C-alpha cells in the first residue's frame, strides 16, 4: 500500500462533485492505512498564469518561482497523486493546465539531461468529471 496520497482538486464551487470525489478518494486511502493530503487549487490561491518568471526558470536564467515551491514539496512527498477535476469545454480547467505549466516543470518533474525528476516512479490517477444540464 502506498503511504502518502496527494489529492489535487480544482473547482471554484464549494460542495461540488469535484470536492466530494476528492474527499472520497482521500477517505478511502485513509481507511486502508495511508495518509492523505487534499490540495484544493482554489483554496491554495494558486495562480495558474505562466509568467516571465516561469519562462526565465525554464530557460535556466532564474530560480524556480517561489509560489510553486510549496506545491512541489507536497507533490514530492506523495507516493500517489490523484488529480480530480471537471471537464470544461472538452478539456481540463485553466487551474489544472496552470499546474502542469508552472509546477510540473523542468528542474522538478524532469531534467533535460534525462536524469529522473522528483516525480519519478509515482503513481498518478486522473479522475475527470463530466456531465451537466442539457443547456450546457
Model regions and ranges:
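N-terminal beta1-alpha1-beta2 submodule of the flavodoxin-like/Rossmannoid cofactor-binding fold
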Residues: 1-108, 112
Amino acid at each position: 500500500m502506498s503511504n502518502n496520497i496527494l489529492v489535487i482538486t480544482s473547482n471554484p464551487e464549494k460542495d461540488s462533485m469535484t470536492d466530494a470525489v476528492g474527499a472520497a478518494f482521500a477517505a478511502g486511502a485513509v481507511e486502508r492505512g495511508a495518509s492523505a493530503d487534499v490540495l484544493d487549487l482554489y483554496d491554495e490561491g494558486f495562480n495558474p498564469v505562466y509568467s516571465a518568471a516561469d519562462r526565465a526558470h525554464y530557460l535556466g536564467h532564474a530560480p524556480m518561482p517561489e509560489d510553486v515551491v510549496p506545491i512541489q514539496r507536497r507533490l514530492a512527498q506523495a507516493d500517489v497523486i490523484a488529480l480530480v477535476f471537471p471537464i470544461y469545454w472538452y478539456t481540463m480547467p485553466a487551474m489544472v493546465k496552470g499546474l502542469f505549466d508552472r509546477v510540473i516543470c523542468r528542474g522538478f518533474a524532469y531534467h533535460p539531461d534525462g536524469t529522473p525528476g522528483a516525480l519519478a516512479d509515482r503513481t498518478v490517477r486522473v479522475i475527470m468529471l463530466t456531465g451537466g444540464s442539457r443547456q450546457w
